[in-house]
């Protein structure tokens, strides 16, 4: 039996080999399709996660903007409170300084008139009158030490008159020295 043009020795392959190749190709195509399905599912999941992440980022940005605005308001609020406290503190200190100055000035004015309340250290001495910066004929000004002594004597008379406590005495003494 001789093989014809459609026989196995001709240009064509037997149907078993063709079907085997077709099955292999179909298996490869099925495998590629399965891989593509998995990849598409992963891309869809990734897109969903990116969308959620974008929503979270927008919410976080809105929260950050709100926080920044409220922090700015709070900063301004406490800055004004601090300014008010500084003004109040300055006013209180100013009032205290004015009271002390008025008290010292009035106590110096009234201290010379009270002759019965002199301390033993100043009882035998008479207060020296303070002239207008000129003493005697030399044209020299009165020494700061004698002014300090006179102020100290006035301070002592005032303390005796009002009965100051020692710590107030120290404060007033330091204040009087600073005035010189």
UniProtKB/Swiss-Prot annotation:
Its main location: membrane. It comes from Aplysia californica. Residues 21-81 form the v-SNARE coiled-coil homology domain. One of its GO terms (biological process) is vesicle-mediated transport. It is found in: Cytoplasmic vesicle, Secretory vesicle, Synaptic vesicle membrane; Synapse, Synaptosome. Gene3D superfamilies: 1.20.5.110. Residues 1-84 are cytoplasmic. (Microbial infection) Targeted and hydrolyzed by C.botulinum neurotoxin type D (BoNT/D, botD) which hydrolyzes the 49-Lys-|-Ile-50 bond and probably inhibits neurotransmitter release. (Microbial infection) Targeted and hydrolyzed by C.botulinum neurotoxin type F (BoNT/F, botF) which hydrolyzes the 48-Gln-|-Lys-49 bond and probably inhibits neurotransmitter release. The record marks 48-50, 66-67 as: (Microbial infection) Cleavage. Residues 1-26, 110-150 are annotated as: Disordered. This is Synaptobrevin. It is a single-pass type IV membrane protein. Residues 1-10 have a biased composition (Gly residues). Residues 105-180 are vesicular. One of its GO terms (cellular component) is neuron projection. PANTHER family: SYNAPTOBREVIN FAMILY MEMBER. CDD domains: R-SNARE_VAMP2. The lineage of its organism: Eukaryota, Metazoa, Spiralia, Lophotrochozoa, Mollusca. Belongs to the synaptobrevin family. Intrinsic membrane protein of small synaptic vesicles. The chain crosses the membrane at residues 85-104. Keywords: Coiled coil, Cytoplasmic vesicle, Membrane, Synapse, Synaptosome, Transmembrane, Transmembrane helix.
């Amino acid at each position: 039996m001789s093989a014809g043009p459609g026989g196995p020795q001709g240009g064509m392959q037997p149907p078993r080999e063709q079907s085997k190749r077709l099955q292999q190709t179909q298996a490869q195509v099925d495998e590629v399709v399965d891989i593509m399905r998995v990849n598409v599912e992963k891309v869809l999941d990734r897109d969903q996660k990116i969308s959620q992440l974008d929503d979270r980022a927008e919410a976080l940005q809105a929260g950050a903007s709100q926080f920044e605005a409220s922090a700015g308001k709070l900063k301004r609020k406490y800055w004004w409170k601090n300014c008010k406290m500084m003004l109040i503190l300055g006013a209180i200190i100013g009032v205290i300084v004015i009271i002390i100055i008025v008290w010292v000035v009035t106590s110096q004015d009234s201290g010379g008139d009270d002759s019965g309340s002199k301390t033993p250290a100043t009882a035998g001495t008479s207060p020296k009158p303070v002239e207008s910066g000129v003493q005697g004929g030399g044209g020299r000004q009165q020494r700061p030490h004698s002014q300090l002594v006179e102020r100290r004597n006035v301070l002592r008379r005032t303390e005796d008159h009002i009965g100051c406590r020692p710590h107030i005495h120290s404060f007033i003494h330091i204040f009087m020295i600073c005035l010189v």
